[in-house]
Every structure is written in C-alpha cells, then in structure tokens.
Amino acid sequence: MPGCPCPGCGMAGPRLLFLTALALELLGRAGGSQPALRSRGTATACRLDNKESESWGALLSGERLDTWICSLLGSLMVGLSGVFPLLVIPLEMGTMLRSEAGAWHLKQLLSFALGGLLGNVFLHLLPEAWAYTCSASPGGEGQSLQQQQQLGLWVIAGILTFLALEKMFLDSKEEGTSQVSGYLNLLANTIDNFTHGLAVAASFLVSKKIGLLTTMAILLHEIPHEVGDFAILLRAGFDRWSAAKLQLSTALGGLLGAGFAICTQSPKGVEETAAWVLPFTSGGFLYIALVNVLPDLLEEEDPWRSLQQLLLLCAGIVVMVLFSLFVD
C-alpha cells in the first residue's frame, strides 16, 4: 500500500487472493459432496420404508390373517358371554328389586357374586400371574422374593386405583354411589377381558387347536363370573337390558388384548404384560368384592338368611373351583 510504513503490507494483496481461492475450493468440494449425502440419506430412508413395509406385510400375511380372524372371533365370543345372565335372571327382576322379596333375591345373587369374585381372584387371576412370572424367570427357576413382592405391589396398586376412582367420582347421593360401584366393576371387567384377549391370541399364535381349547376354557370360566357381575350391575341401579349392554361393551377390552398380542408376535411380550395386568385386576376385583358387595351382606340381621348368604358365597367359590379343575 503506498505510503504505508509497514514492511508486510506489500504482501497483503497476494495473501488475500490465496485465501479467497482456498475458500472457494473448499466450498466447491463441500457442494460436490452434498448430492452424495443426499443420496445416502435417501437410500437409508428407503431401507427403513422397506423394512416397515415388510413387517406390515408379515403381520397381514395369509397365515397371520387367519390368526387375526380366529383371535378376534375368540375374544368376541368371550365378550358375548355377558349376555348369558339374561337367560338366567328372570325378566321381572328389574321391577321386583323395589319390593322386599326382590331385594332379598338380589342379595342372594350378590352372595353368589361375592364367592365368584373371590374365587376368580385367588383361583384364577393370581395363579395365572404367578405362572407368568415363573415362566419369565431366567431358566424357569421359579419366583424370586422380589418378583413375589412386585405381584403384591400390583395388587395393592389395583386396590388403591379403584379407591381413588371411587373417591373422584363419588356422588353425595346414595344412588350415585351405587352407580359408581357398577362402573368400577365394568372397568375391572374390561381389564380382565384384555387379559383374556391376550391369552386367546397367544394360543392361536401357537396353533388353532390350542387357541380353540383356550377359548372354550375361558368361556366356561366366565359364565358364572358374568352372572355375578350382572348382579352387581343390578344392585347399582341398572335395568336388565342396560346391564347387558354395558356387559357387552367390556368385550372391547378382549379385542384390544388380542390385537396387542398379535402385534407383539412374541410370547415374552404377552407374558410380561400379563404379569402385571393380572395382579392389578385382582386388586380391582378385591376392592369391589370387599368394599361394594360385602357391606350389603353384612346388613342382614336374620340368622337364617345370613346362613343362606354364607352358603351361596361358598357355592360361588365351589363353582369357580370346579371350573378351575376342569380347565386345568
């Protein structure tokens, strides 16, 4: 630069030209590599899309489609067992409940329902949960103390969840309180049907024969249980047809369970899910049996009627024992 006293200023122009040329060359290389990066990204995305389409294709293949149809039909049959009480409970039961004789007949049904609920929890749900945790143990060595404690915690979680729900939706009126107990029973039934859907679909994934046997076994087990649930809904203030429709709505849980089991396509995934769903459902049924049903039976002061209630409670347990023996 003219007039500048610095000795290095004369070299500033060539240095600036050199740095500019170097920057342009680097930008050119980077620009040339962008199509390659874009092509690599496109190829990766294509591979992911192909894998996803292959997984969906395997899920909806001919063999899987048969499993889908059989599992959904089996779960739907289990859900439709909620209509069975309409064939057992008299048509005039809804109007009879307002009379003293009708109230006594309802308490008889509730006694049987209480036995069925207790039998379902201690003879079916909890043993199934123990079996699932044993099969999930490494080497099939049985349950550890930690696994047993986890089962107990899930039972407590079910009880506390249903307690919280009843506290949230509890009405100050007695009628509202009864209806809340009915809806809680429907929630427990929906979760229970979810586990049935898991079992049905997992069995059909093995073979059609095992799937059919499992479906029939669950149907036989559910029939006395549905009668008890129907009695609980009648106690909650629903008429026969409303109770039947609400019972049928719980079949959605079975369809969801079947769909979940088929989508996972893994017996391990089904076992891990059932290992906590079953004890959680047990806690819900225990809450309904001991908090909503048992207090009604404790109000009875007549010794002869109290004895009849106790015998019907035992009959409900015996029926669940017999069905458990036949199923096993």
From Swiss-Prot:
Catalytic activity line of the entry: Zn(2+)(in) = Zn(2+)(out)
Lumenal topological intervals: 1-7, 90-108, 171-199, 264-273, 328
Transmembrane segments: 8-28, 69-89, 109-129, 150-170, 200-220, 243-263, 274-294, 307-327
UniProt xrefs under Pfam families: Zip
GO biological process: brown fat cell differentiation; intracellular zinc ion homeostasis; zinc ion transport
Stated family: Belongs to the ZIP transporter (TC 2.A.5) family.
PANTHER family in the record: ZINC TRANSPORTER SLC39A7 HISTIDINE-RICH MEMBRANE PROTEIN KE4 (PTHR16950), ZINC TRANSPORTER ZIP13 (PTHR16950:SF16)
Descriptive protein name: Zinc transporter ZIP13
Organism listed in the record: Pongo abelii (Sumatran orangutan)
Taxonomy of the source species: Eukaryota, Metazoa, Chordata, Craniata, Vertebrata
